[in-house]
């Protein structure tokens, strides 16, 4: 039995939309309902610490074993747990009461590839929606961190994650420089405007011009995102058909968690409409029903506890962890 704590993004006993991996991992544990599956997660405690300092790569979720070993990320954690019970089998029940399946040996390579495809390609698209879609970032993402983190981390963290997302998404929507950043553009524009004229009318007109340019740029980025998402979903569906569709795989959870986050953001209705146009409402409704089942499934397998002082992302521990990196 694996014994340790799983640290996640979340609050009030629920994983946050800010982290696809945290959501998928909670669903993974909740779906371990057979005796064999329960033994895989029975020794785990769920901690919504929101503290990336606990992870060696600065990301959550992270599994910290009692012996000090750390495993970060949904893919790595799931694979680690599977390896500890590699001879176990999970059988399908009824009415979505499936346990997670360890697929047959000949299908394991495809399952592994599918899992990593979702982790790399589709999760990157979710990062775009969280941090680079202006509507989502300003109306939801940026505000959410003030509820999850201590001051002043709630201000710096979203900026850092946005910068990372900008680098990761260059292949999708092209190079995003500082000039594409809303706050940077606005500050530079107003600085230039004040130098040319001090009239209030001129400043307002210039600001509206910059805003219009940004909106057109966002439309272009969204179109590029839509095309990439539709391509990724098509690839995922084609590969998934080659595996047993009567069981829920760990890759299914990560895929649906990505969909759950993207559709749950302020711009989610637009994404849903695009997906329905391409894949039909029946498929989207089927996926939504599965998501609802995962979200509302009883949490009997989740042993939760509050983060201890040393596990919190408060100012004291943040400074301590920072100092430890240079010792």
Curated annotation (Swiss-Prot):
Q: Is Ribonucleoprotein one of the keywords UniProt gives this record?
A: no
* Keyword terms: Membrane, Mitochondrion, Mitochondrion outer membrane, Protein transport, Transmembrane, Transmembrane helix, Transport
Query: Which cellular component terms (GO) are annotated to the entry?
Result: cytoplasm; mitochondrial outer membrane; mitochondrion; SAM complex
Report the superkingdom from the record.
Answer: Eukaryota
Instruction: Give the UniProt record's GO annotations in the biological process aspect.
Output: mitochondrial outer membrane translocase complex assembly; mitochondrion organization; phospholipid transport; protein import into mitochondrial matrix; protein insertion into mitochondrial outer membrane
According to Swiss-Prot or TrEMBL, what is its membrane topology?
Multi-pass membrane protein
Transmembrane segment boundaries: 17-33, 247-265
| Keyword Translocase belongs to the record | no
Annotated compartments: Mitochondrion outer membrane
Q: Which Pfam families match?
A: Tom37, Tom37_C
Functionally, this protein is described as follows: Component of the mitochondrial outer membrane sorting assembly machinery (SAM or TOB) complex, which is required for the sorting of proteins with complicated topology, such as beta-barrel proteins, to the mitochondrial outer membrane after import by the TOM complex.
Please share what else the UniProt entry notes about this protein. Present with 1580 molecules/cell in log phase SD medium.
Q: How does it assemble?
A: Component of the mitochondrial outer membrane sorting assembly machinery (SAM or TOB) complex, which at least consists of SAM35, SAM37 and SAM50. SAM37 interacts with TOM70.
Name of the molecule in the record = Sorting assembly machinery 37 kDa subunit
Which organism does this record belong to?
Saccharomyces cerevisiae (strain ATCC 204508 / S288c)
